[in-house]
Amino acid sequence: MSNKKILFLVNVDWFFVSHRLGIARAAIEKGYEVHLATTVTNQASIIKDTGLILHELQMSRSGSRIIGNLKTLIAIIKIFREVNPRLVHLVTIKPIILGGIAARFTKIHGVIAAVSGLGSSFLDNGIYGK
């Protein structure tokens, strides 16, 4: 029996709806059970109406606080263990880093890392920009 589960990990729901909802719909049409772990703002009804299983996750889009990131990592590991997906699709830098670590801990071998959202890195003149 094959495990036809995909889990998307994205830092905020509106970004997923804007950039990855079409991919999720196609996977559902192919018979996959599709999950989304994300920070929920105002897109939950669109996500659920599409047929995705939504897992609320608090993840800041910026910042490098160790304790906050550690709490987020633990929450991601719990979701990965609960869902046990065949494939995780990690979108944007923070989900790629934390989701990649969580995938190692949970022995998920199917990992897609989609780097996007780098435009803001060119707007800041501080330590995190340029």
PLM region spans:
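An amphipathic, basic-hydrophobic alpha-helix
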Residues: 59-87, 97-105, 130
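Short beta-strand scaffold positions
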Residues: 38, 89-90
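Extreme N-terminal starter segment of soluble prokaryotic enzymes
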Residues: 2-6
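Helix C-cap/helix->beta junction micro-motif
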Residues: 30, 50, 83, 106-107
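A short, histidine- and acid-enriched strand-loop-helix "catalytic/donor-clamping" loop
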Residues: 10-17, 61-64, 105-129
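N-terminal strand-loop element at the rim of the active site
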Residues: 9-68
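Short His-centered aromatic/hydrophobic patch
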Residues: 90-96, 115
